[in-house]
């Protein structure tokens, strides 16, 4: 399973982006704070169960273990915001994140059960945030009819 964070926006505090899984958009809006930003590159990830909580970890360029996403269970993760701290990567925290997080965690669960390797890639992209929001708004309107 390939997870990609495409970064496209930047300000003095954080970098905006989107999360793509196996070539398809999974979470349309991510925020990554500058004080602990991950360098571009590909990292191998693994899933751990800690009590009732599932956590996806990866090792960064310095060899530090970093948490990527967490949820109390694959089925109830949508109830939580996808906040990843220590690690300062927050998928979907701003725009329609909870539903997307639940789907992503379910997909990760299936990949782990199938013993598939999980790779996370961080890359830079030229896409603008307004394009993302327009894209998702268009899909929403299209679904209505």
Label each PLM-derived region with a short phrase.
Residues 1-145:
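Cell wall/extracellular polymer interaction/catalysis modules
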